């Protein structure tokens, strides 16, 4: 989190920020809230995780050094879990535009249980909904602008998804 805070601080005067979450399998949910606080001028929530007997909001609070400019997040079919919490929440609160391809749709927190055979069994322990109450599991985060991965362009040195994100920042001033 310290590296992200430093990077955003160094970009305070930038025209915009791009978060490339393609291929990001997720991580610690609280990090999504921490980053959202560095990009927001008011408090809010990226969504809610509901467990059997309780629920947890992915609340964020504005930080003094928060970035005020436009934000674009690039996702793809391999973006999952916490990256979906971050992208979907930022999209729904209107703080970021999402570009790329629909994410994996695997946003449920889970745990592993070791079986007597030594194998591991993974199972979901909660459900996640975006700020507007949309289930991401099995659906994914749907981009505002769908830009498909283009192998031919990539081989010639052009990343069509990144190019689209840059173009959006240049027109969103």
Predicted regions mapped to residue ranges:
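Short, acidic, Ser/Thr-enriched surface-loop or helix-capping motifs
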Residues: 130
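Short helix/strand-capping connector loops at secondary-structure junctions
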Residues: 139-151
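Alpha/beta-hydrolase-fold serine-hydrolase catalytic core, especially in secreted/extracellular enzymes
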Residues: 136
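Short acidic, Pro/Gly- and aromatic-enriched capping/linker segments at domain boundaries
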Residues: 117, 122-127
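Cleft-lining beta-strand/loop regions that shape enzyme active-site pockets
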Residues: 1-116, 154, 168-172
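Low-complexity, Gly/Ser/Thr/Pro-rich intrinsically disordered linker/tail segments
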Residues: 149-173
């Amino acid at each position: 989190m310290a590296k992200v805070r430093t990077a955003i601080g160094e970009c305070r005067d930038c025209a915009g920020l791009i978060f490339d979450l393609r291929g990001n399998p997720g991580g610690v949910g609280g990090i999504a809230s921490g980053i959202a606080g560095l990009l927001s001028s008011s408090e809010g929530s990226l969504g809610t995780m509901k467990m059997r007997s309780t629920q947890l909001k992915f609340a964020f609070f504005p930080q003094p050094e928060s970035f005020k400019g436009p934000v674009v997040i690039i996702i793809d079919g391999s973006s999952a879990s916490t990256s979906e919490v971050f992208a979907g929440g930022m999209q729904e609160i209107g703080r970021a535009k999402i570009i790329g391809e629909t994410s994996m749709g695997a946003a449920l927190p889970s745990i592993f249980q070791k079986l007597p055979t030594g194998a591991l069994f993974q199972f979901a322990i909660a459900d996640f909904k975006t700020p507007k109450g949309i289930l991401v599991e099995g659906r994914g985060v749907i981009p505002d602008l769908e830009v498909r991965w283009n192998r031919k362009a990539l081989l010639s040195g052009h990343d069509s998804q990144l190019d689209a994100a840059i173009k959006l920042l240049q027109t969103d001033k």
